[in-house]
Amino acid sequence: MKKTHITEQNFADLGLQPQVIDGLNAKGFIKCTPIQAKALPVLLAGQDIAGQAQTGTGKTLAFLTATFNHLLTTPAPEGRKITQPRAIIMAPTRELAIQIFNDAESLIASTGLKAALAYGGERYEKQQQVIEQGVDILIGTTGRIIDFYKQGHIDFKMIQAVVLDEADRMFDLGFIKDIRFIFRRMPAPTERLNMLFSATLSYRVQELAFEHMQEPEHVVVEPEQKTGHRIKEELFYPSNDHKMALLQTLIEEEWPDRAIIFANTKHKCESVWGHLAADKHRVGLLTGDVPQKKRERILEEFTQGNVDILVATDVAARGLHIPQVTHVFNFDLPNEAEDYVHRIGRTGRAGASGNSISFACEEYAINLPAIEEYIEHSIPQSDYDASALLEDLPAPLRLQRRPQQNRRNNNGQRQGGNRKHTRPRQPRNTQS
């Protein structure tokens, strides 16, 4: 869990329970971020909120702190069984659910509360065993949570606090029926503390809040710039024939320490991965079809620096806390303007600078006007010299073949990946 820009509001001055303060202090959280400073006083007064905040603003810590404090100050319902959760936190993706759980585990020890994780792609029995040992806070994706409910392993009759994170993404992924199924089996909104967070408070998100919350107060924290002033943006107009060669040439020139490459489809991601893996880059692939255990391993390797480049669909663009990403490449311009902001927001975090390089190709250049209208500025354009693009590139690997990821031989010398230039490059001409 990162420490983002802060305010002068101290957690210790909010009237939180000592156990909660102890957990925050142990992790070095002393002062609030803007979303925490705005949301926590409202929540500690027992008022529901619908919060608008981007990923990376500290909203996870806000709703975890409020949830812990509410459960510590509110008696557990009489007759509650240990398998009946008192709070539920719903996330749109497995990766986000895991991240929330990890953040909760880092703070929860001093409270005496127990958290459990429920998401698809992981062994059902393993998660069930944890729940059967007792759960106060259930964190997970809606599908697996409903599976446990229908099998009789949990119910929602004793819920005292609810968090819906990335509500707009829930709509995008088609999970709203699941959310309503869960809400309708809980106590009435007046009998629980309700928290909704979303990158945008669109009409449909506000309608959901109206249906299942008790007069929520809207709390809005917007960045000064949608794309962040520390992110250097750059746009190229490659032909389809030049697109892959331009990407590989830019990787050679930029030499990114840690980069994420976004493409719009699973097939395109696999193609990009195949070209980079064949060129001996340490590259990982993150799409919806990658098995969950492998996804977790890839994210861990990327976070630890054992993988330099992650090729991903938008499944990785929101909710994940991946530190020190130096470059984001939009191999395809996203179809939704908001996704551009979420993608490039993976870099330039926690005061660091970052680089965003986007391709307006023949297929996706049509998305550019909507993106620039949304971010309220034009993306600076750069030209490239087609004759300077890499040509000596190996044939791409197929996904079923395991690429050689080791960059060092037995003598400790580096092999492949970010190869030295075989000839001088022509400098790029950047237009303001």
From Swiss-Prot:
Renumbered ranges of motif Q motif: 9-37
The keyword Flavoprotein belongs to this UniProt entry's keyword annotation: no
Domain Helicase C-terminal: 245-390
Motif (DEAD box): 165-168
Reaction(s) the record says it catalyses: ATP + H2O = ADP + phosphate + H(+)
Documented EC number(s): 3.6.4.13
Molecular function per GO: ATP binding; ATP hydrolysis activity; RNA binding; RNA helicase activity
Location of region: Disordered: 396-432
Keyword field: ATP-binding, Cytoplasm, Helicase, Hydrolase, Nucleotide-binding, RNA-binding
Pfam family, one: Helicase_C
Cellular compartments annotated: Cytoplasm
Residues in the signal sequence: none
Residues annotated for ATP binding in this entry: A53, Q54, T55, G56, T57, G58, K59, T60
Top-rank taxon, per record: Bacteria
Annotated Helicase ATP-binding domain residues: 40-219
Transmembrane segments: none
Primary localization: cytoplasm
GO biological process, one term: RNA catabolic process
GO annotations of cellular component type: cytosol
SUPFAM superfamilies: P-loop containing nucleoside triphosphate hydrolases (SSF52540)
Biased composition (Basic residues): 417-426
Job of this protein: DEAD-box RNA helicase involved in RNA degradation. Has RNA-dependent ATPase activity and unwinds double-stranded RNA.
Descriptive protein name: ATP-dependent RNA helicase RhlB
Top-level taxonomy: Bacteria, Pseudomonadati, Pseudomonadota, Gammaproteobacteria, Vibrionales
